[in-house]
């Protein structure tokens, strides 16, 4: 049975709900993963689909977690976003279609040149030590 909007809101919290379902943006430098650099993967807070690896995370200084690439390009979808008079590329999770943030072409050139600027509220971190028990064992190879 599909979760209702209210059940989802209760499960993930108000901020995560507003970010993932209504394309809100958390305030810069307030997210729990902005200055967080432990080894593990980041999954969609709504669906649990694997999105990003700490191996691709870097400190961009933008105030949100920044990644050079998703774990797999098929895990995210890009969408044109012309809101607020800006032209940006919105990033969503493929399965749940959760709003994650935006991707820009000002990332580290030696790592592909992209900066995935992602809201902490859209993510859940799974430490390497918990990958097996949480069902993400196949991603341990990223940390060998």
From Swiss-Prot:
| Positions of the MsrB domain | 5-128
Choose one Gene Ontology CC annotation of this protein and give it.
cytoplasm
Which biological process terms from the Gene Ontology are attached to this UniProt entry?
Answer: protein repair; response to oxidative stress
Active site (UniProt): 117
UniProt cross-references to Pfam families, sorted A to Z: SelR (PF01641)
Q: Which GO terms describe its molecular function?
A: peptide-methionine (R)-S-oxide reductase activity
Q: Which Gene3D superfamilies match?
A: Peptide methionine sulfoxide reductase
Record SUPFAM superfamilies: Mss4-like (SSF51316)
Keywords tagged on the record: Oxidoreductase
EC annotation from Swiss-Prot or TrEMBL:
1.8.4.12
Source organism superkingdom: Bacteria
- Residue runs in coiled coils: none
Similarity annotation: Belongs to the MsrB Met sulfoxide reductase family.
Protein name per the record: Peptide methionine sulfoxide reductase MsrB
Supply the source organism for this entry. Ligilactobacillus salivarius (strain UCC118) (Lactobacillus salivarius)
């Amino acid at each position: 049975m599909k979760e209702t909007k209210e059940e989802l809101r209760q499960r993930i919290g108000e901020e995560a709900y507003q970010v993932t379902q209504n394309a809100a943006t958390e305030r810069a430098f307030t997210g729990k993963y902005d200055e967080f650099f432990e080894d593990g993967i980041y999954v969609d807070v709504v669906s649990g689909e694997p999105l990003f690896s700490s191996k691709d995370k870097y400190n961009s200084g933008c105030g949100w977690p920044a990644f050079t690439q998703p774990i797999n390009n098929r895990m995210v979808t890009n969408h044109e976003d012309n809101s607020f008079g800006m032209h940006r590329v919105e990033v969503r999770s493929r399965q749940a279609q959760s709003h994650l943030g935006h991707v820009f072409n000002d990332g580290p050139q030696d790592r592909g040149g992209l900066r995935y600027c992602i809201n902490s509220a859209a993510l859940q971190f799974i430490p390497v030590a918990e990958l097996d028990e949480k069902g993400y064992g196949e991603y341990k190879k990223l940390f060998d």
